[in-house]
Swiss-Prot record:
GO terms for biological process: protein targeting to membrane. Interacts with ERF2. Signal peptide: none annotated. Its main location: endoplasmic reticulum. It comes from Yarrowia lipolytica (strain CLIB 122 / E 150). Keywords: Endoplasmic reticulum, Membrane. This is Ras modification protein ERF4. The ERF2-ERF4 complex is a palmitoyltransferase specific for Ras proteins. Palmitoylates RAS2, which is required for its proper plasma membrane localization. The gene is ERF4. It is a peripheral membrane protein. Coiled coil: none annotated.
């Protein structure tokens, strides 16, 4: 049996769909590696390309490429996140984070353009004297994630996208002893 992390790219018999992964954010062997699983929300390049990080708004395991199993839960795209968070809450979280990503990284924001011009005209002294829009928005994102985690620590922990280079949005969920 083969286990694919990008399960929606491969569909063949006797392959296991994997919508959650071991907790890579703690040292191997700690008890948290077995109790929490990492559910990854991938970036969606079909919306804005690579202009700025944009995370998929499809609920994990229910993307257009996900497949339901007729052979039982082992081969199903079902995610453990579905038991923990509602669709509305998921869309609110991902939508809010996507908003921060746009404000921080989109080159077409007025603030980005003005800061670039001022930096150029002052020979980049402006960047040394003042915090950039990017830094301010990412600080707001950090605060949002900290508030979200303190409010929902018993259900899930949202990992700051900075920790994985903005490649995915990672939720750590309690699953007990995973049967993998």
């Amino acid at each position: 049996m083969t286990s694919f992390f990008n399960y929606h790219e491969y569909i063949s018999s006797n392959d296991r769909a994997q919508t959650h992964h071991p907790n890579i954010y703690v040292e191997y062997g700690q008890s948290d590696t077995k109790l929490r699983r990492c559910v990854r929300v991938p970036r969606d390049y079909s919306v804005v390309g690579d202009e700025y990080p944009y995370f998929s708004t499809h609920f994990v395991g229910e993307e257009p490429g996900a497949y339901p199993s007729e052979e039982g839960p082992t081969y199903d795209s079902r995610s453990p996140l579905k038991d923990i968070i509602s669709y509305q809450e998921y869309n609110d979280i991902v939508g809010t984070i996507n908003g921060y990503m746009k404000r921080a990284f989109s080159p077409w924001q007025k603030c980005q353009f003005i800061e670039t011009v001022l930096s150029f005209l002052t020979l980049w002294i402006f960047e040394r004297l003042f915090a950039s829009n990017n830094e301010r928005v990412l600080a707001q994102l950090d605060e949002y994630i900290d508030q979200l985690n303190s409010k929902n620590a018993d259900r899930f922990i949202l990992i700051n996208p900075r920790k994985n280079g903005f490649l995915s949005l990672d939720f750590l969920v309690m699953v007990g002893e995973p049967n993998i």
